[in-house]
């Protein structure tokens, strides 16, 4: 009975006992299939924290950089900041409370940049908001962030006896009507179809993340580090290899909210509390191109800066339930840009 109680987290070895008999001994193992979701989370965060500390230790001496603000208000303001430590949010704090509350992304030398991502050199900076004439980059960041939050919710929504494998969050435009996350659930759940109560439960968990006001941390790592962090996820390993192959340095971007870590190109929004109306609205089965059934979870959200009347929200919610495909999304985006 003791052996059964130890279940799949132990390996049974036989040893020759004194006198020629055989005795059994159980030793703990650390193979992928034998780690619980809690243990996986702890392992990933340990590796993330170690890499973050290692990168910080590479610049023990504080170096100063000059950051010039080129926005419409207060143009030409120059901040003297700390290299690899100060972030766009640090600069916003020197401007005003308005910039801290309204800024969703920064443009650093023209490149979209997370608000909490450290600045690496002297540069020009501009802050982006939802109310800009062209909020395209902000909208993309918001959709990515909402998808990552949904991934966090789905990974933790099922009991430990069911394996949940996050595949990826497809990059779909806001105009598609819903953000998405592709997931492979335990084969024991192949016949499961979510009820309205299930969707409400997912939504409730998402609002718990919003209420916690968690920051989106960002960390750029070598592919080998990302592969170690996600060594137990076949789909993430494949995704990491794909992303690493797209740049000669084989750098992969990771993001974290709370203790949930994911692979995301970014940039993402600063904090979960920027979301206001948020709902996990649908789950669709994708065409079976792989041995395992892939589910596409979908949701819709509006930020606190763009709240909608409930009648408009209901229309957005209804639209978000229609299955989003990447081909349709690309076609829609091309039509709107011409």
UniProtKB/Swiss-Prot annotation:
Residues 63-129 form the TGS domain. The keyword Mitochondrion applies. CDD domains: TGS. It is found in: Mitochondrion. GO terms for cellular component: mitochondrial inner membrane; mitochondrial large ribosomal subunit; mitochondrial ribosome; mitochondrion. Its main location: mitochondrion. The keyword Mitochondrion applies. GO terms for biological process: mitochondrial translation. Keywords: Acetylation, Leigh syndrome, Mitochondrion, Primary mitochondrial disease, Ribonucleoprotein, Ribosomal protein. It comes from the Eukaryota. Isoform 1 is ubiquitously expressed. Isoform 2 is heart-specific. The modification N6-acetyllysine is found at residue 126. Component of the mitochondrial large ribosomal subunit (mt-LSU). Mature mammalian 55S mitochondrial ribosomes consist of a small (28S) and a large (39S) subunit. The 28S small subunit contains a 12S ribosomal RNA (12S mt-rRNA) and 30 different proteins. The 39S large subunit contains a 16S rRNA (16S mt-rRNA), a copy of mitochondrial valine transfer RNA (mt-tRNA(Val)), which plays an integral structural role, and 52 different proteins. PANTHER family: LARGE RIBOSOMAL SUBUNIT PROTEIN ML39, MITOCHONDRIAL RIBOSOME PROTEIN L39/PROLYL-TRNA LIGASE FAMILY MEMBER. This is Large ribosomal subunit protein mL39.
